[in-house]
Amino acid sequence: MRRKIALFLALIFVGVSLVSCSSKKEAVSGDVVAVVNGEKITNAEYQQIFEQVKEQIESAPTYTKDIWNQDYQGKKFLDFVKENVLDSLVAQKLLVQEAKKKNITVTDKEVEEEYNKEKQFNSKVTKEQIREYLLIDKLLAEYTKDVKVTDEELKKYYDEHKESFEVMRARHILVADEKTAEDIYQRLMKGEDFAALAKEYSIDTATKDNGGDLGEFPHGVMVPEFEEAAFSLKLGEISKPVKTQYGYHIIKSEGITVKPFDEVKGTIESYLLNDKKNKVIKEKYDELVKASKIQKFPENIKVKVG
């Protein structure tokens, strides 16, 4: 459940706002941050969610206090988070309203079970939030229950994206400076043994004793400079020195293979199914927005950070 809701809210949180607002605002008290079809979202409700998001941000290994004032997508990161928390709350309210209209229900037992799981990841989550998340989850499941992917679609995707399923086997010699790399490259061009030179000179302690053998790796694993050079090599070909953040690499290709369709069919199916479901959910959500009266009052948001 947690992952499904996160996926939906990610549509909002990546900065793609799914919420449109009524241009004519009605007067509300200073404690109201939004009104969705007549239902108010208070600053207290907003604070609950904001604190949970803040806790997750501040628990990240790269967190520093000045992050809130840093520029992100053309605005202060704090303003970005505030706007997107508000949009996510509006989205939740709208979806819960729709779930209730469809007479979707959640039992106390379901809430208790999910709450016990969720609180391990989010210490500030409440049972009422869990109840709403479960209602949304069931609504999204209802929206997407008939979504399927055919074998023809799976095969077509595989045939059109075979490069994505390439797996390379290679060796490399990593050294710290360009001159050493050039010297080793020239010796290789004269026919010296790659594995022997890797054992003698490579500073990659994880592979040097195996003659620089990196084993198999797909696209997206190595740093970009290394990957581009490696996958451009023909079988047995040796690259000129390639500079990366780690130093200078000399790479030898030991061949590229493509994973067979049957091996990657499940991965493709999951990807295409999720893609189709997300499109259906977005279409349904856009319809809800158009049929709703939504007002936001960001000026009433009160939060503290740092």
Curated annotation (Swiss-Prot):
Keyword Lipoprotein on entry: yes
Lipid moiety-binding residues (N-palmitoyl cysteine): 21
Gene Ontology MF term list: peptidyl-prolyl cis-trans isomerase activity
Chief place where the protein resides: membrane
Span of the signal peptide: 1-20
Compartments in which it is found: Cell membrane
Coiled coil residues, start to end: none
Cystine residue pairs: none
Protein known as: Foldase protein PrsA
Organism: Caldanaerobacter subterraneus subsp. tengcongensis (strain DSM 15242 / JCM 11007 / NBRC 100824 / MB4)
Taxonomic classification: Bacteria, Bacillati, Bacillota, Clostridia, Thermoanaerobacterales
